[in-house]
Amino acid sequence: MKTIHLNSCESITKLPDLYCPNLEKLHLSDFKNLNKVHESFGFLEKLKEWNLYDCSQLQILPSTLMLKSLRFFRLPGCSRLEKFPDIHPEMKCLNHLSLNRCGFRELPSSLLYLTGLASLYLSDNSKLTNFLVGANKSQLREEEDIPSAKLRLASNSFNNFSWPTGFLCLTWLDLKGSPIIEVELDSWLQPDYFPVLTRLDLYNTGIVTIPESISRFTTLRQLFLTNCKKLREIPRLPQSIRTVDAMNCDWLDRQSSSRLLNQVSLSFSFSLKFKL
């Protein structure tokens, strides 16, 4: 069996130990009473896609993921899921990680092993205040060549917030509605940390200013700031930018607005509404 695709199975509360060594796709959605996934699902070497959509009672995943072939892992709407599994160093193929609307309070430092990650979605995680908990290069396997294992540790005043300097393949970072964005952006929003970032979603967050470092993101093309009610200042943006959405940023100052308007070109999509 290579594919399992099931919807709305309310009678299932646990995924038991299944012998499916050839499983490549596992799609489960709207399992309202699913609470636990057996450890064996963390060791399916041929699994490429794993989706757990809106499993609102899910609380327990395998403690460790060693899914060497996994490329897509999606957990949107798993609102009671508070602990994310540790990542094995051999999980280098994961390209897309969607953790929208989950219950995570923190994410482990082993995410640094996901060196092929291109898209990371953390939107609407209202409880997420610590990212890469315990992040310390000495905690990672020293024999591994991990580009993302260089760390930038912020001060303790930011709730032990830390960020890696090497999500070297990440092109899309989605943090909309997330409280972790309330730490000072300039402590982690640096081009060396995300050298190929093309899209940054910060809308509906409590940010006040965008750091000057944004101008050095030479690959950034899209910036979304809608409903950032506290946002007051946006510096000059990189020449690569093509889309800015700053609708309903009620306190954005006139200088920022004028600066953005001066950057507008024929290939520049721009939405702006600011307080007069």
Go through each PLM region and give its residues.
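Predominantly recognizes leucine-rich repeat
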Residues: 1-158, 164-184, 188-276
